[in-house]
């Protein structure tokens, strides 16, 4: 195992914004990245881009100064999930996630896999209920709880297992901060600046609303990546968040 410092060569940002990179083309992705400043956001790399371009793509983003949220949502037997999380830590990412529905043994194994990395370990976050899911989707899976209640149950299990926080909808953030405390990190997709298209997300909020609700890190995709001036869009979002703080 090679222990890799997670931030020694990268810029430090206080922004809660994490930009979701969703590109089919590597050159287009890098052209976008070269327009923005790592002091203004972190970047999220998901399944499609990681499968297409591999760990080297993550390394290239890190070399440009960006902290990386590796959004692969590991969900497997405990041993396999633990090795995958350790591999992400070896890569030096800032954050990695697993599915809370993988259960307590899987999450505990993932957490234990990061112990050797010490202070250089990435944040370990669990996914509760995907923001695209509604009550009818859960019912199809035999879950009779509402998305909010089911997410809270999974978040409680996540905290019990010692993880750093959860991915949840912004609507759940107020309740989660009350129940799980300020140190339990909340990462929220489905964030759209005022006037943006909701896209394929069902439960959305503006950045200002998310900050007020207690969200620690907010994932924003197309409103930034499809902007004619993404650098200015990021600066405007961050300025608005600072005014709202």
From Swiss-Prot:
Domain of life the protein comes from: Bacteria
Annotated substrate binding sites: 22, 44, 71-80, 131, 192, 201, 221-222
Annotated active site: 73 (proton donor)
Single GO molecular function: orotidine-5'-phosphate decarboxylase activity
EC nos: 4.1.1.23
GO biological process: 'de novo' pyrimidine nucleobase biosynthetic process; 'de novo' UMP biosynthetic process
SUPFAM superfamilies found in the cross-reference section: Ribulose-phoshate binding barrel
Pathway assignment: Pyrimidine metabolism; UMP biosynthesis via de novo pathway; UMP from orotate: step 2/2
Gene Ontology CC entries for this record: cytosol
Keywords: Decarboxylase, Lyase, Pyrimidine biosynthesis
Transmembrane residue ranges: none
Catalytic activity: orotidine 5'-phosphate + H(+) = UMP + CO2
Pfam family, one: OMPdecase
Function: Catalyzes the decarboxylation of orotidine 5'-monophosphate (OMP) to uridine 5'-monophosphate (UMP).
PANTHER family according to UniProt: OROTIDINE 5'-PHOSPHATE DECARBOXYLASE (PTHR32119:SF2)
Quaternary data: Homodimer.
Family assignment from sequence similarity: Belongs to the OMP decarboxylase family. Type 1 subfamily.
Record's protein name: Orotidine 5'-phosphate decarboxylase
Organism of this sequence: Escherichia coli O6:H1 (strain CFT073 / ATCC 700928 / UPEC)
Gene field: pyrF
């Amino acid at each position: 195992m090679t222990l890799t410092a997670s931030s020694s060569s990268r810029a430090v940002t206080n922004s809660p914004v994490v930009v979701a990179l969703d590109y089919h083309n590597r050159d287009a992705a890098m052209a976008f990245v070269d327009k923005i400043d790592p002091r203004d956001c972190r970047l999220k790399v998901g399944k499609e881009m990681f499968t297409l371009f591999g760990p080297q793509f993550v390394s290239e983003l890190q070399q440009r100064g960006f902290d990386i949220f590796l959004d692969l949502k590991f969900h497997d037997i405990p041993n396999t999930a633990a090795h995958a999380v350790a591999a992400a830590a070896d890569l030096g990412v800032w954050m990695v996630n697993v599915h809370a529905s993988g259960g307590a043994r899987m999450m505990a194994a993932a957490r234990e896999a990061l112990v050797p990395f010490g202070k250089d370990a990435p944040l370990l976050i669990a996914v509760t209920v995907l923001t695209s899911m509604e009550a009818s989707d859960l019912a199809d899976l035999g879950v009779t709880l509402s998305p909010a209640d089911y997410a809270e149950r999974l978040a409680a299990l996540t905290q019990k297992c010692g993880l750093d926080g959860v991915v949840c909808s912004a609507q759940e953030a107020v309740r989660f901060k009350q129940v799980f405390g300020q140190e339990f990190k909340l990462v929220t997709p489905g964030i759209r600046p005022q006037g943006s298209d909701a896209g394929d997300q069902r439960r959305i909020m503006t950045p200002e609303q998310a900050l007020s609700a207690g969200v620690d890190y907010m994932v924003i995709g197309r409103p930034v990546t499809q902007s004619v001036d993404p650098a200015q869009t990021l600066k405007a979002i961050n300025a608005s968040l600072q005014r709202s703080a």
